[in-house]
């Protein structure tokens, strides 16, 4: 997360850098991060400070939704994906779980369609 962000900033790709952070933090805090913090304290502070000030837009939310339904074998049911993450990391914060379900609902309302139909869940295989 921080390496991608810093690298994209160094190249002048601020919007891409933003996505490097926001895709992992649909709740703008590190408190519900799932995974291991393999960053220095300085990098962690940079992530936290940036998350406090970043303004997320529809593109950020769309990338977050895609991240919450993507698996190595294709598109997964969002709850199956979250359960897979829970099994691998031992926990999945309810706040993040609920936020992912809200993202799904948000884009289903925007498109007027089931999100799995939109992304071709039953037909797309990598």
Where are the language model's segments positioned?
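Acidic/histidine metal-binding catalytic segments
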Residues: 12-24
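Divalent metal-dependent phosphate-bond-processing catalytic cores, especially two-metal-ion Mg2+/Mn2+ enzymes
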Residues: 10-13, 31-32, 36-126
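An active-site-proximal "capping" alpha-helix that borders the catalytic cofactor pocket
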Residues: 1-12
């Amino acid at each position: 997360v921080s390496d991608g962000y810093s690298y994209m900033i160094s190249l002048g790709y601020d919007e891409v850098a933003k996505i490097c952070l926001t895709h992992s933090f649909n709740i703008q805090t590190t408190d519900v991060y799932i995974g291991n913090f393999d960053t220095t304290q300085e990098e962690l502070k940079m992530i936290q400070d940036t998350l406090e000030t970043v303004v997320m837009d529809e593109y950020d939310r769309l990338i977050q939704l895609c991240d919450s339904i993507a698996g190595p074998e294709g598109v997964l049911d969002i709850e199956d994906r979250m359960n897979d993450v829970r099994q691998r990391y031992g926990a999945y914060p309810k706040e993040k779980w609920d936020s992912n379900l809200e993202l799904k609902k948000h884009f289903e309302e925007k498109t007027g369609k089931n999100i799995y139909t939109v992304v071709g869940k039953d037909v797309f295989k990598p």
